[in-house]
Amino acid sequence: MQFSTVASIAAVAAVASAAANVTTATVSQESTTLVTITSCEDHVCSETVSPALVSTATVTVDDVITQYTTWCPLTTEAPKNGTSTAAPVTSTEAPKNTTSAAPTHSVTSYTGAAAKALPAAGALLAGAAALLL
């Protein structure tokens, strides 16, 4: 009688833990904006405008939603200081290519595998207990 009580409790615990699935969802959409970068040197500051990639992450912990936004400036080639001699270049005119940015959407999700396997383990334990009775 005592062993069947333990097996019943194990089966109930396995079913209850199956309800605690963990799901993670990721949504991506590329977005750019212009940012102003201020650089200071020797008490003299200068501002430059640069395109930047905008990233936003939303994190929910214990029903508290926190949103993080970052702006990552995209690299641009700046002229290097110093002297240089350019090699002669011969070129032919190539057709102009134009590109336009389009938003990219992707969604992925993951459900915790351990939460799915635990009820099966509880059922196996309950079945083994029933065989031993």
UniProtKB/Swiss-Prot annotation:
GO cellular component, one term: extracellular region
Additional comment: Present with 158000 molecules/cell in log phase SD medium.
Role summary: Component of the cell wall. May play a role in the formation of a tightly packed outer mannan layer, which protects the inner glucan.
Covalent cross-link Glycyl lysine isopeptide (Lys-Gly) (interchain with G-Cter in ubiquitin) as placed by the record, residue numbers: K80
Keywords, in A-Z order: Cell wall, Cell wall biogenesis/degradation, Glycoprotein, GPI-anchor, Isopeptide bond, Lipoprotein, Membrane, Repeat, Secreted, Signal, Ubl conjugation
Sequence ranges of the Sequence repeats: 75-88, 91-103
Propeptide: 113-133
Glycosylation sites: 21, 23-24, 26, 28, 31-33, 36, 38-39, 46, 48, 81, 97
Biased composition (Polar residues): 81-104
Gene source species: Saccharomyces cerevisiae (strain ATCC 204508 / S288c)
Modification after translation: Extensively O-glycosylated; glycans consist probably of single mannose residues. N-glycosylated.
Localization in the cell: Secreted, Cell wall; Membrane
Example of a GO biological process term: agglutination involved in conjugation with cellular fusion
Lineage: superkingdom: Eukaryota
Main location group: secreted
Residues covalently joined to lipid (GPI-anchor amidated glycine): G112
Family membership noted in the UniProt record: To yeast protein YDR134C.
Pfam family membership, one: Flocculin_t3
Disulfide bonds: none
Topology term for the membrane: Lipid-anchor; GPI-anchor
Signal peptide interval: 1-18
GO MF annotation list: structural constituent of cell wall
Protein name listed in UniProt: Covalently-linked cell wall protein 12
UniProt region (Disordered), positions on chain: 79-104
Keyword Secreted in record: yes
